[in-house]
């Protein structure tokens, strides 16, 4: 394996959505492969046909590609090591399983579900770790089952599985890139089923066969697979193969340090896409769930290119990583604040066009969908929104008439003379040839000064009638962006709808 091109893989089961933990596993495999100028491969592990969900494979790959994780080889792309779907590789597993049978590293087992459960319950009652009791281990392999009985069962054609025979009294040791040396006693390892009664291999068997045949150099996966390693290493030993290097990632935890689960929040990548999170923020956030650049670095916002450059498995911790949604929200805001305006326009425009399909506007559609107009809205609102879609939804008054006015703000800001002041000031605004923020501000101050009023007497009512709300960006810049025609129309409508009430 020395000098071999680095090859990593993400091998999901098509059983539903892409979990954020799965996204992290895929990301770390991708980052490591790209940093090492190697290849990242997607393999679909669908050996458990009972859990297979129609369309899940396509959705998994679509979610990965949304995140910017594009495979060099996959079921869709193909490659030199296919097929990349395990259910299309069944003949391979059968041949290798027969080799283990011939070499007496595996045996037929005809135990029924009832027998297995009875044995399990008995061992639990005795305080023992549940394991198969080897009733069907043949005499020639150190068991008690006569070969004639096994042959008779095979001739009868009844259901059976094929189990690996775990050697007695051996220690299984390996070096984990993240955790260091790890050791298991073979006494704790069950005689794992390799081939099920339906002719499909188990995860453990198919995974080892494929990882070897596809020439993966590194296996990077979640901590939950750590206990499977001794079974996998024994299979490598049985076949005389060199195992790949391994790294087991820390668990993802809720804020209370319980294992991340749907009961305490969203765990599907699709949920975060639906809520409007950007792929940049999600990838940045997920990358830091277990990894950090190290002492001396204060950087928290990374592009994919920077992550590839700086990532290393040696900087991944062993302790569980807490999924902090506040951190994700903070990152989302950082990306919005720092992303060039010209990159945000093509993201926001489709959101606006979708809204225009649902709602009518009194503003010129050509104007409000133009790049120049959207750029002005972005510059005014980028410090105030948390998601890209909020440039349209949270800032809807830049595109649609207010359908209501903030009642509390009206109670607080409306005086007996507010409507008459608005009427007078409307006449001044109508005469402005240059409808700019500076010009509007100057004329407003000139208007209120002789009356002994503060600018706030008009600023707040103007904001309410123009936007429907009591908060937002600079009023004068907001009015400039809206334009004279829209502002005059909204002031008139506001005066008609809002009256002073003591």
Swiss-Prot record:
Q: Which GO terms describe its molecular function?
A: ATP binding; glutamate-tRNA ligase activity; tRNA binding; zinc ion binding
Q: Give residue numbers for sequence motif 'HIGH' region.
A: 12-22
Q: For binding ATP, which residues are annotated in this chain's numbering?
A: 262
Its Gene Ontology cellular component terms are: cytoplasm
InterPro entries in alphabetical order: aa-tRNA-synth_I_cd-bd, aa-tRNA-synth_I_codon-bd_sub2, aa-tRNA-synth_I_CS, aa_tRNA-synth_I_cd-bd_sf, Glu-tRNA-ligase_bac/mito, Glu/Gln-tRNA-synth, Glu/Gln-tRNA-synth_Ib_cat-dom, GluQ/Sye
Q: What is its EC number?
A: 6.1.1.17
GO term, biological process aspect, one: glutamyl-tRNA aminoacylation
Any Pfam family hit: Anticodon_2
Instruction: State where the protein is found.
Output: Cytoplasm
Q: Which reaction does it catalyse?
A: tRNA(Glu) + L-glutamate + ATP = L-glutamyl-tRNA(Glu) + AMP + diphosphate
Top-level EC class, please? ligase
Which HAMAP family is this protein grouped with?
A: Glu_tRNA_synth_type1
The function of this protein is: Catalyzes the attachment of glutamate to tRNA(Glu) in a two-step reaction: glutamate is first activated by ATP to form Glu-AMP and then transferred to the acceptor end of tRNA(Glu).
What name does UniProt use for this protein? Glutamate--tRNA ligase
Organism encoding this protein: Pelodictyon phaeoclathratiforme (strain DSM 5477 / BU-1)
Question: Corresponding gene?
Answer: gltX
């Amino acid at each position: 394996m020395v000098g071999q091109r680095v090859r990593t893989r993400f091998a999901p089961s098509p059983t539903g959505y892409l979990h954020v933990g799965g996204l992290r596993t895929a990301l770390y495999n991708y980052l490591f492969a790209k940093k090492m100028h190697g290849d990242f491969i997607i393999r679909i592990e669908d050996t458990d046909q009972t859990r297979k969900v129609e369309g899940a494979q396509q959705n998994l790959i679509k979610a990965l590609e949304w995140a910017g994780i594009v495979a060099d080889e996959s079921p869709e792309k193909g490659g030199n090591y296919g097929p990349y779907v395990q259910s299309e590789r069944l003949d391979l597993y059968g041949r290798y399983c027969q080799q283990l049978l011939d070499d007496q590293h595996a045996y037929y087992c005809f135990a029924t579900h009832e027998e297995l459960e009875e044995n399990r319950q008995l061992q639990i009652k005795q305080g023992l770790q549940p394991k198969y009791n080897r009733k069907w281990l043949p005499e020639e392999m150190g068991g008690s089952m006569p070969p004639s009985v096994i042959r008779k069962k095979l001739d009868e054609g009844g259901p059976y599985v094929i189990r690996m025979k775990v050697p007695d009294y051996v220690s299984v040791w390996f070096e984990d890139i993240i955790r260091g040396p790890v050791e298991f006693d073979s006494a704790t390892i069950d005689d794992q089923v390799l081939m099920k009664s339906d002719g499909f291999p188990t995860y453990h068997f198919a995974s080892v066969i494929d990882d070897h045949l596809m020439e993966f150099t590194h296996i990077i996966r979640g901590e939950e697979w750590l206990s499977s390693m001794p079974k996998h290493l024994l299979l490598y030993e049985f076949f005389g193969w060199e195992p790949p290097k391994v790294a087991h990632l820390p668990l993802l935890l809720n804020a209370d340090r319980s294992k991340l689960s749907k009961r305490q929040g969203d765990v599907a990548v699709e949920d975060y896409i639906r809520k409007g999170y950007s792929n940049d923020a999600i990838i940045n956030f997920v990358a830091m769930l277990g990894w950090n650049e190290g002492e001396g670095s204060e950087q928290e916002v990374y592009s994919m290119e920077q992550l590839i450059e700086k990532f290393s498995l040696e900087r991944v911790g062993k302790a569980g990583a807490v999924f902090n949604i506040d951190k994700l929200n903070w990152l989302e805001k950082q990306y919005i604040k720092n992303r060039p305006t010209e990159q945000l326009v093509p993201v926001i425009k489709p959101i606006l066009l979708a809204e225009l399909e649902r709602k009518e506007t009194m503003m010129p559609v050509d104007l409000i969908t133009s790049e120049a107009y959207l750029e002005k809205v972005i510059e005014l609102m980028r410090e105030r929104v948390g998601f890209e879609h909020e440039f349209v939804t949270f800032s809807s008054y830049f595109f649609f008439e207010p359908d209501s006015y903030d009642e509390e703000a009206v109670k607080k800001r409306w005086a007996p003379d507010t409507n008459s002041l608005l009427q007078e000031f409307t006449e001044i605004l109508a005469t402005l040839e240059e409808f700019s923020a500076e010009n509007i501000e100057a004329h407003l101050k000139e208007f209120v000064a002789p009356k002994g009023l503060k600018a706030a007497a008009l600023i707040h009512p103007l904001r309410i009638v123009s936007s429907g709300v009591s908060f937002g960006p600079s009023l004068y810049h907001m009015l400039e962006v809206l334009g004279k025609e829209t502002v005059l129309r909204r002031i008139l409508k506001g005066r008609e709808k809002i009256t002073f009430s003591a």
